[in-house]
Amino acid sequence: MSSTRSRRKRDPEIVIARDTDSELSSSEEEEEEEDNYPFSESEEEDEAVKNGGKIELEKNKAKGKAPITVKLIKKVCKVCKQPGHEAGFKGATYIDCPMKPCFLCKMPGHTTMSCPHRVVTDHGILPTSHRNTKNPIDFVFKRQLQPRIPPIKPKYVIPDQVHCAVIRYHSRRVTCLEFHPTKNNILLSGDKKGQIGVWDFGKVYEKNVYGNIHSVQVNNMRFSPTNDDMVYSASSDGTIGYTDLETGTSSTLLNLNPDGWQGANSWKMLYGMDINSEKGVVLAADNFGFLHMIDHRTNNSTGEPILIHKQGSKVCGLDCNPVQPELLLSCGNDHFARIWDMRKLQPKASLHDLAHKRVVNSAYFSPSSGTKILTTCQDNRIRIWDSIFGNLDLPSREIVHSNDFNRHLTPFKAEWDPKDTSESLIVIGRYISENYNGTALHPIDFIDASNGQLVAEVMDPNITTITPVNKLHPRDDVLASGSSRSLFIWRPQDNTEMVEEKKDKKIIICYGDSKKKGKKQKRGSDDEDDEDDIFSSKGKNIKVNKYQAKTTKKTKT
């Protein structure tokens, strides 16, 4: 019995002898072979697998034959390379490797499917232990802000239905979005190739793409505070562009690589950018930890670059306080978000350093009062500080959310709803997919930052790609999303559409640069992407489902 068990544990092997003497055989020899070997070769292999042993098959005993060994390898996990289990997608459901920590909360002992922080339709996101940061200063400050912050939260209005879209609008994936400050229907979008698109989603068909502004990825865009037809853009080519949206003409205000490509160790890229209207400066930060400033009245550089993060680390984002213009918030891949006083900008002179466990994708002050801080970290945590005047050593709460990603995606960034007077509603895309009627979809989550509960998750059955770039309109109930190379406009579902037949969506499909060509990574590009586009390009006729986009909302109490 012991020999039988040990034989079954070993991987079965099949040794087949090959005749190398001659390739020709007569019909008589073939008949003899059939008589001598009544079973086919495949049948012998199947029999060998069943017996779990080693079988040697010899068709001829001629000299010069080299045996061929066929080893049947057992299925192993693609993640840990161990047998006995599998990991990966099974249909529309992803199965975790039990030997690895949970992909969502990064803690061992359970899988993603059984994670207590998992976002599903039955319950919302569970916040970690809440720490009360209230002190006497906080209460005094809250009393001063009481006229601005309503005592009762207004009802959330969620844009949960795709109203219109432009498919394959950009030639590469969308990296950033920005609404026009005065024209409600104008949306700006930047992509990985350096193009900037201008789309009037009110008329749908009016759209332009300017490709002569940057050579590689557009990371940030801001409208000029003095001329709303002009826009500033920061790119991975190390330049800040100043573009006229009417004509498409652009000028370069800052170039960190005047001598061109000198190697990866010296190539500078600009990521975070914001405008301080009170100070009259455009702020931009690079991938070496330095802050650069441009006077937007003269469009000339002012002062020397200032080291605001660890030297050699990328500054991912900048945000100016909307109420107190002296305060600046920065974040980077040195695992810190930092608060600065712009009157005393010096290296290692930050007012406070907010520690994180991994790279901080974004950090924002709250849009109305400027007293709260919202950060998104790649440790799958969204962190909220309720008051910048209290104890900032630890966040007021942490929300576990799936925003870890691979390098072929634009980083996820949780953003405030600028219309929410209670400063509690945030929006962010989700990385982990959910199985909806047999289809793997990646919803967009609306979360209540005050308690971590899931307010709504919106999705459309036609959008099967991940949606990392999301922007809420500052005045209208509109959500703009960038998924792969496409743009989508979401609006709240009309009550009349629940009874009447849903109107057809306005969708434009652009085929301008849909054919895949030989890819060559450009200088300054920080990654390569080969994302699958929404709607398969194999079929000529693209059908759009007529049933409604599925939405799950939580009732507020």
From Swiss-Prot:
Keywords: DNA damage, DNA repair, DNA-binding, Metal-binding, Nucleus, Repeat, Ubl conjugation pathway, WD repeat, Zinc, Zinc-finger. It comes from the Eukaryota. PROSITE patterns: WD_REPEATS_1 (PS00678), WD_REPEATS_2 (PS50082), WD_REPEATS_REGION (PS50294). Residues 10-21 have a biased composition (Basic and acidic residues). The keyword Repeat applies. Pathway: Protein modification; protein ubiquitination. It is found in: Nucleus. This is Protein DAMAGED DNA-BINDING 2. It comes from Arabidopsis thaliana.
